[in-house]
Amino acid sequence: DFKINGNDIFTRIKVNIIDLLCGTVQNVSAPDGRNIRLTIPKGTVPNTKFNVPEHGLPILNHHACGNFIIETLCQMPNLTDTDVSRLKSFAEQSKIFDWQISHINI
């Protein structure tokens, strides 16, 4: 699914939460059929937009093309109660989060 704005082409890809947290490389099909090898760094947040220059539509009367912009959507897993328990235990033991929900003032 592609959208066009001027000479830029936009698309969205689903990336699972583990790949957003840990980083990954994903192949993305461009509208012209080329495969774009997209490196998603660890800690990428959902809705991050990656810009691939010169992979959009040709710019009239120029020797250049627009950009191909790829937005990441977070694909959440369906977790069982056991999965949730294991994730909570891992988060507490590994101390990957340096904050606690109880300390947030709203």
Feature-to-residue mapping (PLM):
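Intrinsically disordered, low-complexity linker/assembly segments
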Residues: D1-I106
